[in-house]
């Protein structure tokens, strides 16, 4: 096989007159009155190859037998296309290759779908033939971008003096949040390793070991319910540092992300990134990961409506809840009564008991609840919401968390439906000052908002075991376009604080020692103050590539039901394998 001289997609006018050797796949073949044209594709793009009997009759005869997706080597000379033959849609569209020789390296069956962008095919089929799906230029470009992003992170962290250190995949199962993927031990029957949900504890131990700055581009595993931006295995940019403040860790993160966006998209992002507290994010946007590319902010109108004779509002306020509204500017005409009923059904998914609404027409409030607002109150409400003719006012009344969840989700829905979002914009945001705990209704107790190793604010440490709800954390999340792309914090580095944290979470001293004894021991040997962050590589690439599903940014992903259609994983194993592991399977009973 002759050595390749160029990639197909790299050829341009500078190559005119040069002899080239190309390897690639036949994208398309056209037979036009004695001439054959082949679009040859490789990872860098497509170039047109011309087979002319006057130049090489033998090459033309071989080209006549090739079909789509055949793998070939072509030798020829680069020529300029004629003025009328220039293809502006193609990067190589001003040149073509006049073929002298063609060698068929391998044939191909007819693919189950066209290998081209925009092909209408089910996700299931795409994943079953993922190796074909990845040939499509748009998919190829995503993984070029992923490589650029990964390389940029590595280069930046290396320049900042971080050590790339690997942590084990076979580790101990600890109660950190989601369910673990378990791996049975053959040597110790009845015992299991766990695949890591993150290298959290181990990277903290590397700080105890004195490495000062650690990073790892690491695979993590969580056995949880899936959705569009979740996968059972995912990759994070994981880093940890000693002796730095949270502001310094955030500055390092910003520097990395600015470089990544510049390299991947050639867009310059301003620093420092905007920031807001968790409370402000929930109050204004109803979300702890707000998309700040558009308005539609939530506004508290409890004081305005507390005296109106509308029982839904009155009841919510009397029971310690609140009434909030969104003013969708100039949107009243966009929504019929039927549309508004549908929005009511939508917010019910988030716990809301309904969605009240008003329209502003000719200076007056119109709608089902307008009768509850006498002129003075109507004027006060319009002033409070800066409402004008044509505006649509949407209200939720309930407990604060339900109001936030329902109006926050509604805000995101309206932002898309009303075309308020600039899809080209990249809006980074820090969300800071998180509560250390959140209340789990199902468990009936407080659980870690992030993880049990997050450092409480110093002034709140005495409250750990007495008033958990008031303890704030030295935690920070980084958000991009409404997605959480990373979470970090300063960590607990003193044993007595970690013991107090475990007790606050309901661990007995004995159970804490059993689960985390190795960490507690390490904290007795001079662990330095430390902190870090983990950034979701798959999600960052998803956003930069303009996709809406993580599957597109992972080479061999799972479906929404955690199945791999390509390999048919997960699958059953043999009785011999189970016997070796001293395991039995329990068959699910079916009616």
Swiss-Prot record:
Pfam families: GAD, tRNA-synt_2, tRNA_anti-codon. It is found in: Cytoplasm. Belongs to the class-II aminoacyl-tRNA synthetase family. Type 1 subfamily. GO terms for molecular function: aspartate-tRNA ligase activity; ATP binding; catalytic activity, acting on a protein; nucleic acid binding; transferase activity. It comes from Listeria monocytogenes serotype 4b (strain CLIP80459). ATP binds at residues 222-224, 231, 484, 536-539. Homodimer. One of its GO terms (biological process) is aspartyl-tRNA aminoacylation. Residues 200-203 are annotated as: Aspartate. This is Aspartate--tRNA ligase. Keywords: Aminoacyl-tRNA synthetase, ATP-binding, Cytoplasm, Ligase, Nucleotide-binding, Protein biosynthesis. Catalyzes the attachment of L-aspartate to tRNA(Asp) in a two-step reaction: L-aspartate is first activated by ATP to form Asp-AMP and then transferred to the acceptor end of tRNA(Asp). It comes from the Bacteria. L-aspartate binds at residues 176, 222, 450, 491. SUPFAM superfamilies: Class II aaRS and biotin synthetases, GAD domain-like, Nucleic acid-binding proteins. GO terms for cellular component: cytoplasm. It catalyses: tRNA(Asp) + L-aspartate + ATP = L-aspartyl-tRNA(Asp) + AMP + diphosphate. Its EC number is 6.1.1.12. InterPro entries: Aa-tRNA-synt_II, aa-tRNA-synth_II, aa-tRNA-synth_II/BPL/LPL, Asp-tRNA-ligase_1, Asp-tRNA-ligase_1_N, Asp/Asn-tRNA-synth_IIb, AspRS_core, GAD-like_sf. Its main location: cytoplasm.
């Amino acid at each position: 096989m002759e050595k390749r001289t160029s990639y197909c997609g790299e050829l341009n006018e500078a190559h005119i007159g040069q002899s080239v050797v190309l390897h690639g796949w036949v994208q398309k073949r056209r037979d036009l009155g004695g001439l054959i044209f082949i679009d040859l594709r490789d990872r860098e793009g497509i170039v047109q190859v011309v087979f002319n009997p006057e130049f090489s009759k033998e090459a033309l005869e071989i080209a006549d037998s090739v079909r789509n997706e055949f793998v070939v080597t072509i030798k020829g000379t680069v020529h300029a296309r004629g003025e009328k033959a220039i293809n502006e849609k193609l990067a190589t569209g001003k040149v073509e290759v006049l073929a002298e020789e063609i060698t068929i390296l391998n044939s191909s069956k007819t693919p189950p779908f066209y290998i081209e962008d925009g092909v209408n095919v089910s996700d299931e089929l795409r994943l079953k033939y993922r190796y074909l799906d990845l040939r499509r230029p748009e998919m190829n470009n995503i993984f070029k971008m992923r490589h650029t992003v990964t390389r940029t992170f590595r280069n930046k962290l290396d320049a900042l003096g971080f050590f790339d250190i690997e942590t084990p995949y076979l580790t101990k199962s600890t109660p950190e949040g989601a369910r673990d993927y378990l791996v049975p031990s053959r040597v110790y029957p009845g015992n299991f390793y766990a695949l890591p949900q993150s290298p959290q504890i181990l990277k903290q131990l590397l700080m105890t070991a004195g490495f000062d700055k650690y990073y790892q581009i690491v695979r993590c595993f969580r056995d949880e319910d899936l959705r569009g931006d979740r996968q059972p295995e995912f990759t994070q940019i994981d880093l940890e540092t000693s002796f730095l403040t949270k502001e310094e860790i955030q500055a390092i993160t910003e520097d990395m992300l600015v470089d990544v966006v510049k390299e991947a998209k050639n867009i310059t992002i301003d620093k420092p990134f905007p920031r807001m507290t968790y409370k402000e994010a929930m109050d204004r946007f109803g979300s702890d990961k707000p998309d700040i590319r558009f308005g539609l902010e939530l506004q508290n109108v409890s004081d305005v409506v507390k005296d109106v004779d509308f029982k839904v509002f009155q009841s919510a306020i009397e029971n310690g809840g609140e009434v909030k509204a969104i003013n969708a500017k100039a949107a009243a005409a966009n929504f019929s009564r039927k549309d508004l009923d549908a929005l009511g059904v939508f917010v019910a998914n988030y716990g809301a008991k309904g969605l009240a609404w008003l329209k502003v027409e000719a200076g007056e409030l119109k709608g089902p609840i307008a009768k509850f607002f006498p002129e003075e109150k109507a004027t006060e409400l319009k002033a409070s919401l800066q409402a004008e003719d044509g505006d649509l006012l949407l209200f939720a009344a309930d407990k604060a968390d339900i109001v936030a969840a329902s109006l926050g989700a509604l805000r995101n829905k309206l932002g898309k439906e009303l075309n308020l979002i600039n899809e080209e914009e990249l809006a980074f945001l820090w969300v800071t000052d998180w509560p250390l705990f959140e209340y789990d209704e199902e468990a009936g107790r407080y659980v870690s908002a992030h993880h049990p190793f997050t450092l409480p604010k110093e002034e709140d440490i005495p409250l750990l075991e007495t008033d958990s709800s008031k303890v704030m954390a030295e935690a920070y999340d980084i958000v991009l376009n409404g997605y959480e792309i990373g979470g970090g914090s300063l960590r607990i580095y003193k044993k007595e604080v970690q013991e107090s944290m475990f007790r606050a979470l309901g661990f007995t001293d004995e159970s804490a020692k059993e689960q985390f004894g190795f960490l507690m021991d390490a904290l007795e040997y001079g662990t330095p103050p430390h902190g870090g962050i983990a950034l979701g590589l798959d999600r960052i690439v998803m956003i930069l590539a303009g996709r809406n599903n993580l599957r597109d940014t992972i080479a061999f992903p799972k479906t929404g039901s955690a199945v791999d259609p390509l390999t048919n994983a997960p699958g059953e194993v043999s009785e011999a394998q189970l016997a070796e592991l001293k395991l039995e399977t329990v068959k699910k009973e079916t009616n």
